[in-house]
Structure formats: structure tokens, C-alpha cells
Amino acid sequence: MANTKSALKQIRKNNLKRLQNKFVLKTTKTAIKKLKLESKKNLNAFPKISSLIDKLAKKKIIHKNKSNRIKSKLVKLIN
């Protein structure tokens, strides 16, 4: 267990950040699933999902290579 006030504060901050990252990642994953289900109908959703994935990579929630890989798979799926 943490002994200092600053260590306790860091734990609180880390827990909050973890929850925020988890939420953003989950919403992106559900958006990707929706796009996969409606790939031919919903072509307008790809730019939004692509920007979400880029934001995840920019915030280092996912690795930039993984974001490129996901976007590449989605483009192949749409075309």
C-alpha cells in the first residue's frame, strides 16, 4: 500500500485514467463491430471510426501499428 499522500493521489489518478481509456476503447470497438455488420450499407461511418482509432493511437491507448492494421482491415472489408 502507498505510504505518502502523493502516492495515494497517483493511484487515484491512475484508476480514473484507466477507466477513461477503457471506456474510449470499448466505444471504438463497438463502432468497429457495427461497421463490420453493416459494411456495405454504412460507408459514411468509416471516416469517423478511422478518426477514433487515430485518436486512440495519439493518446497511446493502442499502438500506432495496431491502429494502422485495424484501419487497413476495415478498408479491405469495405472494398
Swiss-Prot record:
InterPro entries: Ribosomal_bS20, Ribosomal_bS20_sf. GO terms for biological process: translation. GO terms for cellular component: ribonucleoprotein complex; ribosome. Keywords: Ribonucleoprotein, Ribosomal protein, RNA-binding, rRNA-binding. The keyword RNA-binding applies. One of its GO terms (molecular function) is structural constituent of ribosome. Binds directly to 16S ribosomal RNA. Belongs to the bacterial ribosomal protein bS20 family. This is Small ribosomal subunit protein bS20. It comes from Karelsulcia muelleri (strain GWSS) (Sulcia muelleri).
